[in-house]
Regions:
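Structural motif
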Residues: 7-8, 100, 123-124
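Conserved phosphate-binding and hydrolysis motifs of nucleotide-dependent enzymes
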Residues: 55, 113, 124
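Conserved acetyl-CoA-binding loop-helix of GNAT-fold acetyltransferases
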Residues: 75, 81-98, 114-122
Length: 156
């Protein structure tokens, strides 16, 4: 709960819970199976040494055809910059392309979220679009950058 309720860690997120009950409700809405079109599926990121939840990774299964999805990642402040997001994303992308046979994976990023931009670029995603003022977030209109990668481009 601590990293998900931290406003600084989640300043680019749409979900910043104020109470533990909100987390319980969010988890209860999570589908029980992965790869259901139109749903978000959340995975937790656990630090092996401490067995502590340090972040999460969301997968949005887009459309009815099942060939595309969107990824997003949140890491606690004290664990950022240590490679956890990169490792979790690589494992998840491998699974999505090689096990679930996805064709394309995207990421939607606020242009001010430099860490996420660097993460997606490090993973060899390409910048596909920059939409001006198309998301209403935290009381104001913000831009959105879309990154994408095809299965045929994934080399990890």
């Amino acid at each position: 709960f601590s990293y998900r309720s931290d406003s600084e860690t989640n300043k680019y997120q749409g979900f910043v819970p104020k109470k533990l009950q909100e987390i319980d409700e969010f988890i209860a809405k999570n589908p029980l199976e992965i790869n259901r079109p139109g749903t978000w599926f959340q995975l937790v990121i656990i630090e092996k040494e401490t067995d502590k939840i340090i972040g999460d990774l969301g997968i949005h299964f887009i459309g009815d055809d099942g060939f595309q999805c969107e990824l997003g990642c949140t890491i606690s402040k004290e664990h950022q910059g240590k490679g956890f997001a990169t490792k979790a994303m690589k494992i998840t992308i491998d699974y999505l392309f090689n096990t679930l046979n996805k064709h394309r994976i995207t990421g939607s990023i606020d242009p001010d979220n430099i860490s996420s931009i660097r993460l997606f670029e490090r993973l060899k995603f390409r910048r596909e679009a920059h939409f001006k003022n198309n998301l209403f977030h935290d009381g104001k209109w913000v831009d959105e950058i879309i990154y994408g990668i095809l299965k045929s481009e994934w080399k990890h």
